[in-house]
From Swiss-Prot:
GO molecular function, one term: ribosomal small subunit binding
NCBIfam families, sorted: rbfA
Gene responsible for this protein: rbfA
Subunit comment: Monomer. Binds 30S ribosomal subunits, but not 50S ribosomal subunits or 70S ribosomes.
The species this protein was found in: Salmonella arizonae (strain ATCC BAA-731 / CDC346-86 / RSK2980)
Family: Belongs to the RbfA family.
Gene3D superfamilies in UniProt: 3.30.300.20
Pfam family, one: RBFA
Main location: cytoplasm
Identification of the protein by name: Ribosome-binding factor A
Amino acid sequence: MAKEFGRPQRVAQEMQKEIAIILQREIKDPRLGMMTTVSGVEMSRDLAYAKVYVTFLNDKDEDAVKAGIKALQEASGFIRSLLGKAMRLRIVPELTFFYDNSLVEGMRMSNLVTNVVKHDEERRVNPDDSKED
């Protein structure tokens, strides 16, 4: 029977919570003025590397997103040291931050589906109008 929820997944889940707390309370970088959310963490099998996926409250501005990711990368050593104290791991993983655009893509897809459904309902209500298109 295979492990469904192994150690890397458990460590990643706990690390996600701890990094979110650290970003909220400890990081005072002005480039991170927008609210930062940790949407996920992926751990390597040997727990030496972690990919941290983040989203920002005001993610419409690409320059602000790039500046935010750069600020997180520059603060990764500090975040790592705080993470080591909070989690008491033998090896604190090397952190790499990525912007998670899945939320934005999900909203875009939801809007597309909503528009199609609305258009379909309009065609059902007014079948004569659709023949003119």
